[in-house]
């Protein structure tokens, strides 16, 4: 099977939505019965985004096989059924690390190591490996054309396209077509210059996706096609929409998928977008609105919680409730108290690292428990719930996590030094281990306890969910906490690590060590988020009576 490649680049400005465009195109091609995968090539020097600040880079998305990757891979998994792996995302740093390791080993037999051919060859090898076994591979190059960091990647995809031939490779370029209110017209010159920049490095785009706040009329698209040497039918207008899940239908209405399948000579059925039509229908036809408070430390950049944001929306789709997220900085709770939490229908505390703001998260868990407000804790959100319960219910004054206070009286959360993954392999860590890539990562088996909320929601005795953490509940102190009324309802593969906790005498208080947001999709939703949003709606109804 010959894989067909679609290379996606962006020009004029950053944040044009290359990831959404790539994922939407993939969704249409998948709906035509094609086996599609998507890759993201990131030009930064970090080996992976695992140690990057969420307020700079946004969320770190974790794949099933435990790779810490770009948040765009989350978009990919939400739009197509193909599961991403560590082969779907790599960086300049990863490429250079691989090449330098080979050089030190003597693999290059004394050759002078250069960007061309050694770095570009390494990029091509990884792209080919990631595309293996798929009919279509969509390859998104991060950054903006013209950035110095992107040049090796652009050169590599130029070479690869030449090697596989015109019938197996196409280039799709996203640009901005701004509307100038003073002139009362759309301006195409930035797009022309962006394409000129691409041409200067040997790439002629086959398709232009033109981003704008309005539909670009046919005469303007014809003008863009003429000056950029692209057929008019391949100049696609992608206007701003109120939901990203409308993009597949928007692109399909302009026959973008047919343009690719015709060029590639692929015979396949017409795209059935009924599942996406259902998503859009559910989104537009909610019966009520709930407000969920997200208490975190990275709230200045909502993209730091991208998958959580989307999972809450998916929970709303499955319960016919519109979800409004109120972002609350946990540090503000420390200074202003519970007033910031008033009027919420539910409280969610997501994952995070470091001591800053942790006491505010503990207060949020306390407020939710004492006021019977639905609470969902994720990763650190479970740990702070344990700390709060230990302090205020189990009588363990001074309880904390050893991550934040090593000499605390009751270290109810501590470093995981050893665990068994779902395949039976023993993983070990110490406090001296590197920060990058050393956490408990990826999909892990979890046993659910009978007669628990989570067992009822999932409808299965075992589940697989993705993890990203170094710290876990201290089992030595667990009996005292459980005796006070908290219940452990989820356990790891070897049944030694606490994965889920509940408070039985609370209407809905559930916290998980794993990250359920990474497996939520708009078409299928997720059991935990659907249950959480439903509980928020029920809480709202109780308070309106």
Swiss-Prot record:
Residues annotated to bind UTP: 14, 187-192, 223
One GO BP: pyrimidine nucleobase biosynthetic process
Cysteine pairs bridged by disulfides in the record: none
Binding site for L-glutamine: 352, 380-383, 403, 470
Residues reported to bind ATP: 15-20, 72, 239-241
UniProt KW Ligase keyword: yes
Gene3D superfamilies: 3.40.50.880, P-loop containing nucleotide triphosphate hydrolases
Annotated CTP binding sites: 14, 147-149, 187-192, 223
Matching InterPro entries: Class_I_gatase-like, CTP_synthase, CTP_synthase_N, GATASE, GATase1_CTP_Synthase, P-loop_NTPase
Region annotation Amidoligase domain: where it falls in the sequence: 1-266
Catalysis performed (reactions): UTP + L-glutamine + ATP + H2O = CTP + L-glutamate + ADP + phosphate + 2 H(+); L-glutamine + H2O = L-glutamate + NH4(+); UTP + NH4(+) + ATP = CTP + ADP + phosphate + 2 H(+)
Domain Glutamine amidotransferase type-1: 291-542
The protein's Enzyme Commission number: 6.3.4.2
Active site, UniProt feature: 379, 515, 517
Residues reported to bind Mg(2+): 72, 140
Database matches in PANTHER family: CTP SYNTHASE, CTP SYNTHASE-RELATED
Subunit and interaction comment: Homotetramer.
Function comment: Catalyzes the ATP-dependent amination of UTP to CTP with either L-glutamine or ammonia as the source of nitrogen. Regulates intracellular CTP levels through interactions with the four ribonucleotide triphosphates.
Similarity-based family: Belongs to the CTP synthase family.
Misc: CTPSs have evolved a hybrid strategy for distinguishing between UTP and CTP. The overlapping regions of the product feedback inhibitory and substrate sites recognize a common feature in both compounds, the triphosphate moiety. To differentiate isosteric substrate and product pyrimidine rings, an additional pocket far from the expected kinase/ligase catalytic site, specifically recognizes the cytosine and ribose portions of the product inhibitor.
Protein name: CTP synthase
């Amino acid at each position: 099977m010959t894989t067909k490649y679609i290379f996606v680049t962006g020009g004029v400005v950053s944040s044009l939505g290359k990831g959404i465009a790539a994922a939407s195109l993939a969704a249409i091609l998948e709906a035509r019965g094609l086996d599609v995968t998507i890759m993201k090539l990131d030009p930064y020097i970090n080996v992976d985004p695992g140690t990057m600040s969420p307020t700079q880079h946004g969320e770190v998305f974790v794949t099933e096989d435990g790779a810490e990757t770009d948040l765009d891979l989350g978009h990919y998994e939400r739009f197509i059924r193909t599961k991403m792996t560590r082969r779907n995302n790599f960086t300049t740093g990863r490429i250079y690390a691989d090449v330098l390791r080979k050089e030190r080993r003597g693999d290059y037999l004394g050759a002078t190591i250069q960007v061309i051919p050694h770095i570009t060859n390494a990029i091509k090898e990884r792209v080919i490996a990631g595309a293996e076994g798929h009919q279509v591979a969509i390859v998104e190059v991060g950054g903006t054309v013209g950035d110095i960091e992107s040049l090796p990647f652009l050169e590599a995809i130029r070479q690869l396209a030449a090697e596989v031939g015109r019938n197996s490779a196409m280039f799709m370029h996203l640009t901005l077509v701004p509307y100038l209110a003073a002139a009362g017209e759309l301006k195409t010159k930035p797009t022309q210059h962006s394409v000129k920049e691409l041409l200067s490095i040997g790439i002629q785009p086959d398709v232009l996706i033109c981003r704008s706040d309005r539909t670009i009329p046919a005469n303007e698209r014809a003008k863009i096609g003429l000056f950029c040497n692209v057929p008019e039918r391949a100049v696609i207008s992608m206007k701003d929409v109120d939901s990203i899940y409308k993009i597949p239908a928007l692109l399909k209405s302009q026959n973008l998928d047919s343009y690719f399948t015709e060029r590639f000579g692929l015979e396949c059925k017409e795209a059935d977008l009924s599942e996406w039509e259902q998503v859009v229908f559910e989104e537009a036809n909610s019966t009520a609105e709930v407000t969920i408070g997200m208490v975190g430390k990275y709230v200045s950049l909502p993209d730091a919680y991208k998958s959580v944001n989307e999972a809450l929306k998916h929970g709303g789709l499955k319960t016919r409730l519109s979800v409004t997220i109120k972002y609350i900085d946990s540090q503000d709770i420390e200074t202003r108290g519970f007033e910031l939490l008033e009027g919420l229908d539910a409280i969610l505390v997501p994952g995070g690292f470091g001591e800053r703001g942790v006491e505010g998260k503990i207060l949020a868990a306390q407020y939710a428990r004492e006021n019977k407000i639905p609470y969902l804790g994720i990763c650190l959100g479970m740990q702070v719930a344990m700390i709060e319960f230990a302090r205020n219910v189990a009588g363990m004054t001074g309880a904390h996590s050893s991550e934040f206070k090593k000499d605390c009286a009751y270290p109810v959360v501590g470093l995981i030094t050893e665990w068994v993954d779902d395949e039976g392999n023993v993983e070990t860590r110490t406090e001296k281990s590197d920060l990058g890539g050393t956490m408990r990562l990826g999909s892990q088996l979890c046993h659910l306890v009978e007669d628990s909320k989570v067992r009822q929601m999932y409808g299965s005795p075992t589940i697989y969910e993705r993890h990203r953490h170094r710290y876990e509940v201290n089992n030595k102190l667990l009996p005292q906490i459980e005796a006070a009324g908290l219940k452990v309802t989820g356990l790891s593969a070897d049944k030694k690590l606490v994965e889920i906790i509940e408070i039985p005498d609370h209407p809905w208080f559930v916290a998980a060590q794993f990250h359920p947001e990474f497996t939520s999709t708009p078409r299928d939703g997720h059991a935990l988020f659907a249950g959480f949003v439903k509980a928020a709606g029920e809480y709202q109804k109780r308070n309106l009576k």
